[in-house]
């Protein structure tokens, strides 16, 4: 399943980049994120809870930043499983920043997600709808936090 989106934030590209590559900041924007633990400079252990239909899951996974082209591109590879054995997933994501002006950045992302197991039985339509809902919540939270962070900076 491929999920992609574009949105614009009002902040300088450097601030957006620094926020984006900080997993603790990003974790606060991800609905259901319970934990982010640094393994090394590019790899993090993450626990996120979510629901798809009647199934509630807690995914434990690692995410690794495998390509970094500062301040415009980030490639992340993730792999993990539900702690309750409802399924597992792999994901590759590309995030691109494009400076529109000194105070505006377009963010585009594309994620290719492969889910297997009981959770996959709900089909792409239901999982896509849930992913869209989570994506919208993430974008709203990300935008609010980065724009608030900009206002707090002298």
Residue ranges and their predicted role:
Residues 118-154:
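A conserved amphipathic terminal alpha-helix motif
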Residues 5-7, 34, 60-67, 90-99:
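Hydrophobic/aromatic beta-strand elements that line small-molecule binding cavities or substrate pockets
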Residues 80-129:
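Beta-strand/loop substructures that line and gate deep hydrophobic ligand-binding cavities in soluble
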Residues 1-47, 51, 153-154:
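Hydrophobic ligand-binding cavity/cleft-lining segments
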Residues 38-81, 137:
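Glycine-rich portal/gate segments that line the openings of hydrophobic small-molecule binding cavities
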């Amino acid at each position: 399943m491929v999920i992609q989106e574009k949105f614009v934030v009002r902040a300088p590209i450097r601030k957006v980049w620094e926020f984006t590559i900080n997993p603790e900041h990003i974790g606060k924007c991800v609905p259901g994120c319970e934990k982010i633990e640094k393994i090394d400079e590019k790899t993090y252990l993450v626990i996120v809870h979510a629901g798809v239909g009647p199934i509630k899951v807690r995914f434990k996974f690692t995410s690794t930043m495998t390509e970094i082209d500062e301040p415009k591109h980030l490639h992340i590879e993730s792999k993990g499983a539900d702690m309750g054995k409802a399924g597992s997933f792999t994901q590759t994501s590309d995030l691109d920043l494009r400076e529109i002006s000194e105070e505006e950045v377009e963010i585009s992302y594309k994620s290719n997600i492969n889910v297997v197991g009981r959770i996959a039985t709900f089909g792409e339509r239901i999982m896509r709808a849930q992913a869209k809902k989570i994506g919208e919540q993430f974008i709203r939270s990300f935008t609010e936090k980065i724009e608030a962070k900009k206002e707090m900076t002298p």
